[in-house]
Amino acid sequence: MWQQIQYKAGEKMISIAIDGPSGAGKSTISRAAAKLFGFIYVDTGAIYRTIGLAAKLRGIDVSDNDAVISMLPELRIELIYNESGEQCMLLDGADVSRDIRLPEVSMLASKVSAIPEVRVYLVDMQRKMAQLHNVVMDGRDIGTVILPNADLKIFLTAGAEDRARRRYEELLQKGVETTFESVLDDLIKRDEQDTQRAAAPLKAADDAVLLDTSGNTLEQSVSEVCRLISERTGIKPE
């Protein structure tokens, strides 16, 4: 059973922006931290992945910017939460939360996210979430573009092989057949696309706290992020 986000109003919301490259642990760490503080977790990358998947399902070449842009008004994309509080993505009413995690969709997401009109199309939606909720929002341009006035900005990173290993293990757990070499190759290509795109390239905000998660356990990384949030907001995790 799905439930729509319940909006709050009339109070100043707290926003935590977490950016970083693919495989740095953004989603897992952000989700865990949000749960501990009772905040809404927003995985913006899932939205771009959903657009990439929509293009694939419609037979649209994501390198054809005009075709992708023309498709946007036709899409019905919903970010909702299930009874366990997990973020789920619906595309035209269908749950695509698993489909958007496939490696090929990751590359499509990187390409559609490089289209300026796509990013502009999604900016208001993402900012609205932060205006109406206490959020931990992760992505690649949250601290630099989406939430430039976030209460706290964190830039997560790790070595390419560490990130590829995490992504590889994550895919195996989800039953996706792949190889470590393939995941590493895709990750390096994704890094290149994300850092070199003209529209909102991946980079740390000038006032972001840099956090290298190389060699860290999940618990260590979550603990460090929670410490930073507590120091900045005065709120203690539950």
Annotated model-derived regions:
Residues K12-S15, L132:
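Pre-Walker A (Motif I) flank of P-loop NTPase domains
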Residues I18:
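Hydrophobic anchor at the beta1->P-loop junction of P-loop NTPases
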Residues P21:
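P-loop (Walker A) phosphate-binding loop of NTP-binding proteins
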Residues K26:
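Conserved lysine of the Walker
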Residues I29:
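Hydrophobic positions on the alpha1 helix immediately C-terminal to the Walker A/P-loop
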